[in-house]
Amino acid sequence: MADEIEAWFDAAGPRGEELRRVDELVTAAAPRIDRQLVPMGSSAMLGYGLMPYRPRSAKETTMWPLISLAAQKRHLSLYVSAVVDGEYLAEQRAERLGNVSCGRSCIRFTSLDEVDAAELSALVRDAVAATAAGGNGYSAT
């Protein structure tokens, strides 16, 4: 799997180094989290920490990453699939994360230099801790 992940970074071209920097931040904040490539249409994203998830429209539960990293055309996206006390953690902390654009679970930025790394690390740690403690309501949203 490590070779496939390295190939994914390399395939990102000039964005590969920025993706590696984000990967280092995530794995430093959550050192025991597993990593795997997750298919997304014709491409893939890097997923961290698979957890049970069932979309409202699905009849069966599947496995989905708690955190995902993807390179988009103009930015990077870090998806944090964590809902605590009815609020998406990414959306709840958007103002503290720096020069980012946030959706419910998506944090978009062009460079990690524009992100408050300490806040993003804390967000990753809190998402992992909430999930481990059974307090992540993402699959119920």
Task: Annotate each language-model stretch with its function.
Residues M1-T141:
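Charge-dense, helix-prone N-terminal extensions
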